């Protein structure tokens, strides 16, 4: 149980450190999604927190609030997909 156990413990510690570094890196990154040809723009960070939202006044129609709701949803989905794509690349490079 001597050197084999110590080696596995060291590998686990290295993987934990790599994971923490990846997590910290993601927190600093921003991913943007747009909808309606830029009428709505949402920026999220790697923790999926919304960093900013921009709305062009031309898409605000009090008679049809569902339009803006759909645009927000689409913009957020696009930003999340960009984040997920990068995250999957990062995960693929991890040794575990």
Curated annotation (Swiss-Prot):
Stored Pfam families: YbaB_DNA_bd (PF02575)
GO cellular component: bacterial nucleoid; cytosol
Compartmental location: Cytoplasm, Nucleoid
Organism per entry: Chlamydia abortus (strain DSM 27085 / S26/3) (Chlamydophila abortus)
Official protein name in the record: Nucleoid-associated protein CAB326
SUPFAM superfamilies attached to this UniProt entry: YbaB-like (SSF82607)
Residues in the signal sequence: none
Main subcellular localisation: cytoplasm
